[in-house]
Curated annotation (Swiss-Prot):
This is U3-theraphotoxin-Hhn1a 15. Disulfide bonds join 54-67, 61-72, 66-79. InterPro entries: Huwentoxin-1, Huwentoxin_CS1. Belongs to the neurotoxin 10 (Hwtx-1) family. 51 (Hntx-8) subfamily. Hntx-8 sub-subfamily. Keywords: Disulfide bond, Ion channel impairing toxin, Knottin, Secreted, Signal, Toxin. Ion channel inhibitor. The keyword ATP-binding does not apply. It is found in: Secreted. The keyword NAD does not apply. PROSITE patterns: HWTX_1. One of its GO terms (cellular component) is extracellular region. It comes from the Eukaryota. Its main location: secreted.
Length: 87
């Protein structure tokens, strides 16, 4: 009877240990793609900002000219889409 209780306890402890190891491994795997994607997009955004000499949509246009397809709003000093009612 004691031997059966000990074997059940060891089996239960082994399953708990296996669960903890699997959870830790899975959480590491989930973090890796997130870190990889965030580093790719961070580098990509930095590259785009260095490449531009013009201001994009809803960016300040006091010192920079707006990119093609946008006009500088005289009221807000932001680059906006051109429209007939904006003069």
């Amino acid at each position: 009877m004691v031997n059966m209780k000990a074997s059940m306890f060891l089996t239960f402890a082994g399953l708990v240990l296996l669960l903890v190891v699997c959870y830790a491994s899975e959480s590491e795997e989930k973090e890796f793609p997130k870190e990889m994607l965030s580093s790719i997009f961070a580098v990509d955004n930095d590259f785009k900002q260095e490449e531009r000499d013009c201001a994009g949509y809803m960016r300040e246009c006091k010192e920079k000219l707006c990119c093609s397809g946008y006009v500088c709003s005289s009221r807000w000093k932001w680059c906006v889409l051109p429209a007939p009612w904006r003069r």
